[in-house]
């Protein structure tokens, strides 16, 4: 439709639609018409493609056919779920007027706006994943970033210092919807994301943001939240809060504070590290064979979501980590017993968010009641546990006897889905409601009596009394007996084989019954809102309890996992280093059919780098990753897959493991590898754990070897990070002879004829050979190709042994440390623009003599 179309050229109904659509130009408008939600014009075309629904036409308005698409009202939630998964938003427009009394189109208004980041309805949410709305701000000083989980009220801000840190935050939080200012410059950072929303600059204004936040929290300033000077973050938070208010159209009492996330509080992991360690998503984008898949047996959705947050934000505070370790140890004997009532608590966190938004459904209140009923048993089980952190959490879990009593008296045992269906409020809760219900419920008895009386009085054996949703109450008589009905029977409807009538007595009763049903439903809706009013003052204590219950679920889950998977409690030390005895990869050991070979690891100030050699498939990458995962689990407060582990201070974990072309950004495999390597060399510290796997393999042999050598040298001598450096460049195994703190280890294999057996056991010293051809044969490379490769290998090894350029003397690697020839030095010092022709000729002869 053209923007300059005049409203008065359209039908009254389309005028109403266009006025509503003008208020929501950028999102799909679902316009209620009878039993359908209809979409028109460009919305209809978009919805047809997005939802795979038929595109039709509805008459004409302003002289043109109107494109139209629609979905049944009872299926709307399914279609909305599909839209939000695609990053789309929708406005839901309902009929609020009475068609019987309306002159012209029935009055309609938009009653809710559904966006990917602001949904709270359980039908639209993934129950075991956070669903975040985020806002981003950027200027010369850096980035501001805010996230809100509206389904829990969790509001966080951060100020990433640079592009790489911001990219890592986006990857960690993975928002469903992202608000950004219209002048945002680094679009490459976000342009590939779903759910992008461009916002005007004024929505990020700092003073307005502070005013909005203080108003929301009921404070005079933001000093108490520690964010008063976080101006970049506050700009993002202000825009985010305004957007939520605009879309939700209600107060947000469950959003009661703001938390500043600071990098120094946790172990920093960049986007590549999170991806390579496969914490919650595998390299194929799925959730199978990830750390979360093994570790998460939480019995509540809110516990599962909390555990995933812990996985992505390992912390450094030894006091908090020790509290968690002690709690896990204290819960091991009762974990299974505790999980029984916890399972019945369900997703209390999201139920409370819907209560705060006044969108909680009857079954939410029934689930809340059921959760309250579990609290005494949880208290009984935990009171004997003499662990401070467990008792602290238990003190936050209230026992809401009065609220439980309210819900037991007010809500029926198994309520319907919606309040408008009626039958939500229990009998005996309200006398007036009971009276109106009695009148409505007595209809069946009355109709039975009327049917018997009229049938006997008139002698019509086909006569029966019934009710139809369109025509109301009726007396039906077969066509063959219809000529016998008395004159006061007024025909209401004609069927193929029968006639339907109404009589004054039945009409009077119909009015009374319909009035009583309407009255009962109106009273019920009012009482339902009153229950909200009685529950909402307790929201802060309820949220505190839900959070404590979620953490108890996580800790009980980790206790069960430690017992089941034979994990041990790591020692957290303030002395630098990592010492692991019998370490195992938590995921690989669960998917392997044969027993997993455990391995030790020692890193210390005197042993800062391990050069790891050995065959492909020998277990180098597994050994490296398991070290990172053990360190990460220790910084959750979890037990770890090892016989024993002592973990010193860690500030960052870096992984340069594997790579693939980044086609979307036009970057080759080697470019991706070098970008990740550069990030490590710029940001790693002495307290960082660095995994470097096969650096330099994406280019020529000499280039690759040179880069690998220089990177290893830099990490070992300048940065002094704790490094696991896997390589196939055997020249690097001479590094320990030249540098302190560098040690060779290897994973071995045994060849027998043309077969190979991988030992998967880490040994001190360098590997003796690479076994590349044996692995190729194992992979199914044709025998004649393997045979030819063996011949060629012998030729190359013979050439290599005779070539001076490939030798490495005892003090230096000539390939990398050759002196610059005098002729080259002379050329570098020469300024050709200052030479006369004669001088240039003299220089040519001089250089020739140097060569």
Swiss-Prot record:
Gene3D superfamilies: 1.10.1420.10, 6.10.140.430, DNA repair protein MutS, domain I, MutS, connector domain, P-loop containing nucleotide triphosphate hydrolases. Keywords: ATP-binding, DNA damage, DNA repair, DNA-binding, Nucleotide-binding. It comes from the Bacteria. The keyword Nucleotide-binding applies. GO terms for biological process: mismatch repair. One of its GO terms (cellular component) is cytosol. One of its GO terms (molecular function) is ATP-dependent DNA damage sensor activity. The keyword Transcription does not apply. ATP binds at residues 614-621. InterPro entries: DNA_mismatch_repair_MutS, DNA_mismatch_repair_MutS-lik_N, DNA_mismatch_repair_MutS/MSH, DNA_mismatch_repair_MutS_C, DNA_mismatch_repair_MutS_clamp, DNA_mismatch_repair_MutS_core, DNA_mismatch_repair_MutS_N, DNA_mismatch_repair_MutS_sf. Belongs to the DNA mismatch repair MutS family. NCBIfam families: mutS1, PRK05399.1. PANTHER family: DNA MISMATCH REPAIR PROTEIN MSH1, MITOCHONDRIAL, DNA MISMATCH REPAIR PROTEIN MUTS FAMILY MEMBER. This protein is involved in the repair of mismatches in DNA. It is possible that it carries out the mismatch recognition step. This protein has a weak ATPase activity. This is DNA mismatch repair protein MutS. It comes from Yersinia pestis. The gene is mutS.
